[in-house]
């Protein structure tokens, strides 16, 4: 497998995250809640579940495709570190409610999205 392909996919994922995040966070309401980070993480969880189901469950894609798209594109598209930074920032400014809602929604919906993606990918 080519490390270059993983790197190119990672670069594309990072650019996609930046564009999606900027588009969502630039809408009315701004950064009262980190919707851009939330959206890419939930979408990425769904897509990685789907990709895994298609590779492992159905064998429709080669395992190498899962590595390039999963570790490369989706690994760069989603962002655990930015999510934690958003939580820290909410706590720093004393907005414990926003931090709790962000943590609960991101974790709960992220797990649900991954499960849904797996179910769709496996065909169940």
From Swiss-Prot:
Q: What's the catalysed reaction?
A: fluoride(in) = fluoride(out)
| GO biological process, alphabetically ordered | cellular detoxification of fluoride
Q: Which Pfam families match?
A: CRCB (PF02537)
Q: Which UniProt keywords apply?
A: Cell membrane, Ion channel, Ion transport, Membrane, Metal-binding, Sodium, Transmembrane, Transmembrane helix, Transport
What are the TM regions of this chain, as residue ranges? Answer: 4-24, 36-56, 67-87, 103-123
Query: What Gene Ontology terms describe where this protein resides (cellular component)?
Result: plasma membrane
Q: Which domain of life is it from?
A: Bacteria
The record's annotation in InterPro entries points to: FluC
Q: How is its activity regulated?
A: Na(+) is not transported, but it plays an essential structural role and its presence is essential for fluoride channel function.
- Subcellular locations according to the entry: Cell membrane
Q: How does it sit in the membrane?
A: Multi-pass membrane protein
Single Gene Ontology MF annotation:
metal ion binding
Q: Which family does the similarity line name?
A: Belongs to the fluoride channel Fluc/FEX (TC 1.A.43) family.
**UniProt-listed HAMAP family:** FluC
Q: What role is this protein assigned?
A: Fluoride-specific ion channel. Important for reducing fluoride concentration in the cell, thus reducing its toxicity.
Q: What is this protein called?
A: Fluoride-specific ion channel FluC 1
Species: Symbiobacterium thermophilum (strain DSM 24528 / JCM 14929 / IAM 14863 / T)
């Amino acid at each position: 497998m080519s490390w270059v392909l993983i790197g190119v996919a990672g670069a594309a994922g990072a650019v996609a995250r930046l564009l999606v995040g900027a588009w969502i966070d630039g809408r009315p309401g701004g950064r009262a809640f980190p919707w851009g980070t939330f959206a890419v993480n939930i979408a990425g969880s769904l897509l990685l579940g789907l990709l895994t189901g298609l590779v492992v469950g159905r064998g429709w894609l080669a395992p190498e495709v899962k590595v390039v798209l999963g570790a490369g594109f989706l690994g760069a598209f989603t962002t655990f570190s930015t999510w934690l930074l958003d939580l820290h920032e909410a706590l720093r400014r004393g907005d414990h409610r926003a931090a709790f809602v962000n943590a609960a929604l991101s974790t709960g919906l992220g797990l649900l999205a991954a499960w849904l993606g797996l179910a769709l990918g496996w065909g169940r």
